Amino acid sequence: MENTNLRTKTLRDGTTAEELFSQDGLSFNDFIILPGFIDFDSSKVNVSGQFTKNILLHLPLVSSPMDTVTESSMARAMALMGGIGVIHNNCTVEQQARMVRSVKLYRNGFIMKPKSVSPDVPVSTIRNIKSEKGISGILVTEGGKYDGKLLGIVCTKDIDFVKDASAPVSQYMTRRENMTVERYPIKLEEAMDVLNRSRHGYLPVLNDKDEVVCLCSRRDAVRARDYPNSSLDRNGHLLCAAATSTREADKGRVAALSEAGIDVLVLDSSQGNTIYQVSFIRWVKKTYPHLEVVAGNVVTQDQAKNLIDAGADSLRIGMGSGSICITQEVLACGRPQATAIYKVARYAASRGVPCVADGGLRNVGDVCKALAVGANVAMLGSMIAGTSETPGEYFFKDGMRLKGYRGMGSIDAMLQGRESGKRYLSENETLQVAQGVAGAVLDKGSVLKLLAYIHKGLQQSAQDIGEVSFDAIREKVYEGQVLFNRRTLTAQSEGAVHSLHHYERKLFASKL
């Protein structure tokens, strides 16, 4: 019997998504996905997903723009692993732009305007550049121009023991004839391969006049080897997103972020269906057409329609479902997350707009369900809070190593910066109503290991469902081929750990 016949479901044993979400508002724990037929290894599963219309992520995960989750360290880690980080905006414009630049420069790919000096520059200048900008390899060119004729290169190791700081770098540089160079044009992968085979730290790429076109570094080649699925722009830099509010004053923030090099602008609002956001989307798409715009948050199709009509490239779905969010409790407004994702994402898909599941995700199973019922990628907050890459310091309480984690609608966050209040349209109010809480979470170690665990978990989830990608799963969900079951409270209890005196829970183990 052929595998295609084994994969066909001839008995209707389960509930379709359309039936499942036809009435009640459901969260992830309220249903389970029924298994399919397996004829492939889990390593063959492609978990990639569209973050925006033009940006595909190898790992369909995005870190939330919260001031206790995503700054430059988290954004770098997310992009290295194939996802993307959204740097929060509860800070000054200058601080946010500086964090964006830190991410964009972490892996350079082709350095299009490499730092260069003239041959008569003193050694002291090179040392100052190293201490101020962290650059350890500087080209020496005619006139000191970044696109001038190459004369040599001076590295930190060349001048470590030079006592005369006034001596010209020409005395200590590695000369052009002793350098490995390549001719333009060359593909980034080819340039990295040359660096791997050479024993030099840098590879200048020159035109036929021996003038510098760009530069590649060994450090970037190592990072390319260690993180082959990194999210990169066309120049080989890490992808980076940043959040902003949608008031008139925020146009200056967008200008600074665009100059810093962001790839995606995330409009941060708990309720995105406003005249402010509609107008802001139109302005951004007209003024900065190269920027991808993620709009939201939304939980209904009508909300989604207005933002898509305005020009949104992606939508964030979720209102009041996060672990530190109390919007539904305080304001009686929102929607259960699984239902919101299914309803909004199905409409958005008909318009060619991808969606981000934002909130309510507690484990790999929840992420799998969110992706299965419509989301293209998942935004993580509490799941990655407490990792070493998040902002803040660890502290101990009752013998546990903890890190602070708070909602952007908490009083603590709104008092720290006015931008957090803008998210909830309350920055100018004398009395601010909290829509979030502040708390702490356990130390989770490095997010790099946690993301690898989530990636493998998603692959195994898709394998059990019987499909080789989440695109295929969503297609089968919409066709009624992937089926579900509602879960009673006792069924949920049965599916959790039970009937044990005690147990130890470890999420994953690495085999060396």
Swiss-Prot record:
The keyword Ubl conjugation does not apply. Gene3D superfamilies: Aldolase class I. One of its GO terms (biological process) is GMP biosynthetic process. The active site is at C325 (thioimidate intermediate), R423 (proton acceptor). It is found in: Glycosome. Pfam families: CBS, IMPDH. GO terms for cellular component: glycosome. NAD(+) binds at D268, S269, S270, G318, M319, G320. Residues 110-169, 173-231 form the CBS domain. K(+) binds at G320, G322, C325, E494, G495. IMP binds at S323, D358, G359, G360, G381, S382, Y405, R406, G407, M408, G409, Q435. Its main location: other. Its cofactor is K(+). A motif (Microbody targeting signal) lies at residues 510-512. One of its GO terms (molecular function) is metal ion binding. It catalyses: IMP + NAD(+) + H2O = XMP + NADH + H(+). It is an enzyme of class 1 (oxidoreductase). Pathway: Purine metabolism; XMP biosynthesis via de novo pathway; XMP from IMP: step 1/1. Keywords: CBS domain, Glycosome, GMP biosynthesis, Metal-binding, NAD, Oxidoreductase, Peroxisome, Potassium, Purine biosynthesis, Repeat. Mycophenolic acid (MPA) is a non-competitive inhibitor that prevents formation of the closed enzyme conformation by binding to the same site as the amobile flap. In contrast, mizoribine monophosphate (MZP) is a competitive inhibitor that induces the closed conformation. MPA is a potent inhibitor of mammalian IMPDHs but a poor inhibitor of the bacterial enzymes. MZP is a more potent inhibitor of bacterial IMPDH. Its EC number is 1.1.1.205. Homotetramer. Belongs to the IMPDH/GMPR family. Catalyzes the conversion of inosine 5'-phosphate (IMP) to xanthosine 5'-phosphate (XMP), the first committed and rate-limiting step in the de novo synthesis of guanine nucleotides, and therefore plays an important role in the regulation of cell growth. This is Inosine-5'-monophosphate dehydrogenase. It comes from Trypanosoma brucei brucei.
